Amino acid sequence: MDALYNAAKPRVVAIGGPTATGKTALSVALAKRFGGEIISADSMQIYQGLDVGTAKVTPEEMQGVPHHLVGFLAPEQAFSVADFTTLAGKTITQLTAQGKLPLVVGGTGLYITSLLNGIGFTPEKVDPAIRQELQARLQAEGSQALYAELAAVDPGYAAKVHPNNTPRVIRALELYRATGRKMSAEREAARPAEKPYRSLCLCLTCRDRTLLYQRIDTRCDRMMQSGILEEAKLVYNHRDTYRTAAQAIGYKEFFPYFEGTADLESCLAHLKQASRNYAKRQLTWFRRQTDAVWLYLEDGNLEQQAAEQTEAFLAENNA
């Protein structure tokens, strides 16, 4: 298979789509079949000790396939899309040099599209005073106040960001307050004339939205059985330092239970609803990727379909 990796541009297979669609299992099967390794494109699975609530791949699920960018960062540390594209790019270079197929797998669409499109990000030094001021305002006024400020100064970027995606809202406000530059303009300037990789993007979903929601509910129930409450309590107890995790779906839904303002059943119902809403946003993001190949769970035989797509992609001539 070495000849398949001699192109000037490395070949990369990405697997995306909403939560609870079987991306992990499919990626492991393809990695074993095509001699690949997996690069996680999940903004929460990077953290150490946060396994259940992030649906982090287990050693059993890995089946001996090496996984990169999983569980390597302390929860106190911030991690940006710039950090991801830098580390993932280095990993792709290393794997390609070894004759291995890089598979970029996860539900964080921004990570995948930024990497495959070669969007460059220049990490800026954050002024601690600006960040502290924004964090204080978040605590006092809530995420909607920060989002309203972003919509006022950079409506183009605000339209692409969910109001509850606080880390991205804060990052854009930090940039604007520190430099006067808009994140929307930074994004446009960062887009290269040519993509750095030859890529195949496979996206998994269900034709029937009800089936997807059932799978999400089942996953949430399994998380309860696997100890998500203990992880959520850990995050709650460290919410001032685990700032990213404290905003993540899977943990913040249980904070009212720890505060004595809601029962466990209602918190679990809230988690299921938040996860379904997140899946809708993931679908919206990935549907904008015009070159994505969609695979539907109802059709069955996903592994064979994905293998055929991958085989054809790898056999394409290098011109």
What are these regions (language model features)?
Residues 1-319:
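Phosphate/pyrophosphate-binding catalytic cores of soluble transferases and nucleic-acid-acting enzymes
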